[in-house]
């Protein structure tokens, strides 16, 4: 580390929705010569994922209270004090020029200590409904950034930082115009499998005449792939040239770009990625998400005619089959173009620029 090299500390953990956008910003800052250190939970996914990206880590142990018993709640003051002490030690070791909070439970104690020690804090909220931690810290932060307009008062709308390849896909007009034949459907269940989609989609496709059925790529997570295959077979559909069942998709940018329509949940990063690529989507929000934020995430696109929103309680094979019959490549292309128009493809650069500016530096060029 040179005497002029600046340091960014990223605070994020718990879920991919916090970690992956943090990684996008971290890589952007590293490309500009910044030193980046990550503050996370040793029990979180970040403890395994972040070091693989060549980013050193500091650790804070702190968890949430939702669904926990009385013992955990009574221990909160002790756990909070311990987390604050761990955060203070980490900040003293790293001496960051600016701290970026991307969410996760550890952001609360670490964010408080950041402010109390006089270091500049930048917050980024990924969801359309801010969590309690960010609602509190937003009143103390130097700059507050949001992925969805209106998520926090007096915040700057930057969008969600995404991987570079997603922001560089060919525009939807060109992609859709070059296609002919059957529609291409991508179903994304994520690592958890989205059991509702795994059950309804095969039955809906079975209700369509063979010439009405789209080509399907259905991703379901390794633990659910055998059950998914059974669901398709029970619906009378065999895997072959028109149905591909996969446990994982390595290249999501290509998967989105090759699809005419995506059926999926509406996590913050999924919505951001679909808009960035520009692809038609039918969102089925996870009904048990905190504060039902997946519904409001999906509404951001659906209210502009850039996606369709169906609640899981309303989703049926008959409803989905009827809706699919009414779609054409032209109608889906129009939806995709509206989605792309609402994207924030430069979100990674914007968040990185804010961090640099708060530290009194400039960021050059674009990723």
Curated annotation (Swiss-Prot):
<comment type="pathway">
    <text>Cell wall biogenesis; peptidoglycan biosynthesis.</text>
</comment>
<keyword id="KW-1003">Cell membrane</keyword>
<feature type="binding site">
    <location>
        <position position="127"/>
    </location>
    <ligand>
        <name>UDP-N-acetyl-alpha-D-glucosamine</name>
    </ligand>
</feature>
<comment type="similarity">
    <text>Belongs to the glycosyltransferase 28 family. MurG subfamily.</text>
</comment>
<keyword id="KW-0997">Cell inner membrane</keyword>
<feature type="binding site">
    <location>
        <position position="294"/>
    </location>
    <ligand>
        <name>UDP-N-acetyl-alpha-D-glucosamine</name>
    </ligand>
</feature>
<dbReference type="GO" id="GO:0009252">
    <property type="term" value="P:peptidoglycan biosynthetic process"/>
</dbReference>
<feature type="binding site">
    <location>
        <position position="163"/>
    </location>
    <ligand>
        <name>UDP-N-acetyl-alpha-D-glucosamine</name>
    </ligand>
</feature>
<dbReference type="InterPro" id="IPR006009">
    <property type="entry name" value="GlcNAc_MurG"/>
</dbReference>
<dbReference type="GO" id="GO:0030259">
    <property type="term" value="P:lipid glycosylation"/>
</dbReference>
<keyword id="KW-0131">Cell cycle</keyword>
<keyword id="KW-0472">Membrane</keyword>
<dbReference type="GO" id="GO:0005975">
    <property type="term" value="P:carbohydrate metabolic process"/>
</dbReference>
<keyword id="KW-0133">Cell shape</keyword>
<keyword id="KW-0132">Cell division</keyword>
<dbReference type="GO" id="GO:0050511">
    <property type="term" value="F:undecaprenyldiphospho-muramoylpentapeptide beta-N-acetylglucosaminyltransferase activity"/>
</dbReference>
<dbReference type="GO" id="GO:0005886">
    <property type="term" value="C:plasma membrane"/>
</dbReference>
<feature type="binding site">
    <location>
        <begin position="15"/>
        <end position="17"/>
    </location>
    <ligand>
        <name>UDP-N-acetyl-alpha-D-glucosamine</name>
    </ligand>
</feature>
<comment type="function">
    <text>Cell wall formation. Catalyzes the transfer of a GlcNAc subunit on undecaprenyl-pyrophosphoryl-MurNAc-pentapeptide (lipid intermediate I) to form undecaprenyl-pyrophosphoryl-MurNAc-(pentapeptide)GlcNAc (lipid intermediate II).</text>
</comment>
<dbReference type="InterPro" id="IPR004276">
    <property type="entry name" value="GlycoTrans_28_N"/>
</dbReference>
<dbReference type="Pfam" id="PF03033">
    <property type="entry name" value="Glyco_transf_28"/>
</dbReference>
<feature type="binding site">
    <location>
        <position position="249"/>
    </location>
    <ligand>
        <name>UDP-N-acetyl-alpha-D-glucosamine</name>
    </ligand>
</feature>
<dbReference type="Pfam" id="PF04101">
    <property type="entry name" value="Glyco_tran_28_C"/>
</dbReference>
<keyword id="KW-0328">Glycosyltransferase</keyword>
<keyword id="KW-0808">Transferase</keyword>
<dbReference type="GO" id="GO:0051991">
    <property type="term" value="F:UDP-N-acetyl-D-glucosamine:N-acetylmuramoyl-L-alanyl-D-glutamyl-meso-2,6-diaminopimelyl-D-alanyl-D-alanine-diphosphoundecaprenol 4-beta-N-acetylglucosaminlytransferase activity"/>
</dbReference>
<dbReference type="GO" id="GO:0071555">
    <property type="term" value="P:cell wall organization"/>
</dbReference>
<dbReference type="InterPro" id="IPR007235">
    <property type="entry name" value="Glyco_trans_28_C"/>
</dbReference>
<dbReference type="GO" id="GO:0051301">
    <property type="term" value="P:cell division"/>
</dbReference>
<dbReference type="GO" id="GO:0008360">
    <property type="term" value="P:regulation of cell shape"/>
</dbReference>
<keyword id="KW-0961">Cell wall biogenesis/degradation</keyword>
<keyword id="KW-0573">Peptidoglycan synthesis</keyword>
<feature type="binding site">
    <location>
        <position position="191"/>
    </location>
    <ligand>
        <name>UDP-N-acetyl-alpha-D-glucosamine</name>
    </ligand>
</feature>
<protein>
    <recommendedName>
        <fullName>UDP-N-acetylglucosamine--N-acetylmuramyl-(pentapeptide) pyrophosphoryl-undecaprenol N-acetylglucosamine transferase</fullName>
        <ecNumber>2.4.1.227</ecNumber>
    </recommendedName>
</protein>
